[in-house]
Amino acid sequence: MNVMRRLKSIASGRTSISSDPGGDYALKRAKLDQENDNLCVDPMQVDQNSSCFEMKADVLSQESVAGTSNVPAVSEKPVDDQLPDVMIEMKIRDERNANREDKDMETTVVNGSGTETGQVITTTVGGRDGKPKQTISYMAQRVVGTGSFGVVFQAKCLETGEQVAIKKVLQDKRYKNRELQIMRLQDHPNVVRLRHSFFSTTDKDELYLNLVLEYVPETVYRASKHYTKMNQHMPIIFVQLYTYQICRALNYLHRVVGVCHRDIKPQNLLVNPQTHQLKICDFGSAKMLVPGEPNISYICSRYYRAPELIFGATEYTNAIDMWSGGCVMAELLLGQPLFPGESGIDQLVEIIKILGTPTREEIRCMNPNYTEFKFPQIKAHPWHKIFHKRMPPEAVDLVSRLLQYSPNLRCTALEACAHPFFDDLRDPNVSLPNGRALPPLFNFTAQELAGASTELRQRLIPAHCQGTGSSS
């Protein structure tokens, strides 16, 4: 059934919208899970025999842009900076120095690609500013994610025994890697940490960038799927914790780093299953959005793609991340994606089924250049009918504030952090179900709170944390 016939059927009342927003979601879920099994190893599990680290393997949509590549996408300006000759000649960079200056390192990759089990990759760090050279060796343990971007493998540092994840991507020698440049700027408890990076070559003289990342043993996707398989809903405390940390990380990215992630989805949200600290990963699609400068609209995995992207907007804002965050929150509450479209247009149908037909003004806010307006008039489906009757009203309210057609009406990340839905987290007596203390939630830096009103600050930081500079 084409998009117009489907919308007309919904408008006429022939197609109902039940508590299963996707309608035939079970079939779509089965197809999705099969794609997961075929395209990528499952995200990391808690048990030691099956733990893995899922990154950019986009199993939700073949339409998603794998922006990790250094080759600029169509209509998006390339990163013009040329790589220094020393990098082309296989000198490597150490990202751990405080002043962001580059340090040369040499790398050796023994026979093979460096990703086979047991393969050892040796790099030499230091050798500048009077500091001695230090050899670091990583033993590849398993490939845990593949995609058009390259490969991610789990490795062990032989000197320290530390587990890391190494993301290996083909490097275009003409350009700097945008993902690397962005990750070098970041330092936040809810953003995956870049330990350092190095370059390696193959027998075909191909240059690869290797990002050495901290290892986090779970994903929100896997955690959610765990409860779905048991026919249970994720405990509300975990929905609160994960959503809050997503919003806090997005506030940091948007306001401090000045970056839009552009691919927020459960697979890109890492979680420590013991502490429940969340970290956003995979900055292969991330970009600093410049007002007036066009960007590609074919970005973000489909289920989490903001409507302005579907309408072809090229001058969008960080609000696309807030839409994606709202979709993730709704999915955790429902146990399934809220908008499970099977194509770009089908995605719009799923959104309209719940939000109703966008008004002309809403379409103008999403894309001023979009003039076509032929959609049947469909009324918005009440949010309280989408979720279970016992769902906290604060949860429903926050979802509704994030999933607005007009990007400028969506609450900002910092405003979301102050929402009453998270008041339970601000209770000094609250703890994790396992008895542990909550992960750091309120240790905001001055940069994170820059521009926030006194009232907002008071709502953000609970009384028992104010003036202490410490987190819960």
Curated annotation (Swiss-Prot):
Root EC class: transferase
Signal peptide: none
Binding residues for ATP: 144-152, 167
Reactions listed under catalytic activity: L-seryl-[protein] + ATP = O-phospho-L-seryl-[protein] + ADP + H(+); L-threonyl-[protein] + ATP = O-phospho-L-threonyl-[protein] + ADP + H(+)
GO cellular component terms attached to this protein's record: nucleus
Sites of Phosphotyrosine modification: 298
Short name of one Pfam family: Pkinase
EC number: 2.7.11.1
Keywords assigned by UniProt, alphabetized: ATP-binding, Kinase, Nucleotide-binding, Phosphoprotein, Serine/threonine-protein kinase, Transferase
Span of domain Protein kinase: 138-423
Glycoprotein listed as a keyword: no
Active site: residue positions: 263 (proton acceptor)
GO molecular-function term, one example from the UniProt record: protein serine kinase activity
SMART domains: S_TKc
Superkingdom of the source species: Eukaryota
Function: May mediate extracellular signals to regulate transcription in differentiating cells.
Family per similarity comment: Belongs to the protein kinase superfamily. CMGC Ser/Thr protein kinase family. GSK-3 subfamily.
PANTHER family named in the record: GLYCOGEN SYNTHASE KINASE-3 ALPHA (PTHR24057), SHAGGY-RELATED PROTEIN KINASE THETA (PTHR24057:SF60)
Name listed for the protein in its UniProt record: Shaggy-related protein kinase theta
